[in-house]
Amino acid sequence: PGTLRLDTPAGLVIAEYKQVGEHVEEVRITNVPSFLYAEGLTVECPVLGEISVDVAYGGNFYAIVDPQKNYRDMADHSANDLVAWSPVVRQRLNEKYSFAHPENPGINRLSHMLWTGAPTHPEADARNAVFYGDKAIDRSPCGTGTSARMAQLHAKGKLKEGDNFVHESIISSLFKGRVEKE
């Protein structure tokens, strides 16, 4: 086993890896502290109309879109739909609300969208599509996104310290997370 200490814009991230021969088989990452920042923020989304989002931090600020009246599940929409809507929704949220990390004033805007849905993989607890940048959907469940999602679920009493959480991506890849401490 080995350990890497990564100095990221969000803070120190520790990566512990298990190597077998010349290949790394498993990596465990201890992320920066994550937290639910805001609940129930409303915004107009193209095509869908008004939606409500929670905003959580897991290394970046995420607008998390859970099932609701105008949005049932990410499976109902194409990746192209999410790529088209996400920058508009993100911009509108940044114009309407303020986002500021309590310990790092340089982190002061919502940068990612996390669209949720029911898992399709038998081992997964939840599924997501993470939009970032100008027009990209992450193929992985996203480490900072998984941390933000877990912080949201923990704050709402759906995960507690020590609970495991398996997050599925838009292409069914999996990340395993655990609430380490409150």
Show which residues each predicted segment covers.
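Active-site proximal loop and beta-alpha junction motif in alpha/beta enzyme cores
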Residues: 1-144, 148-182
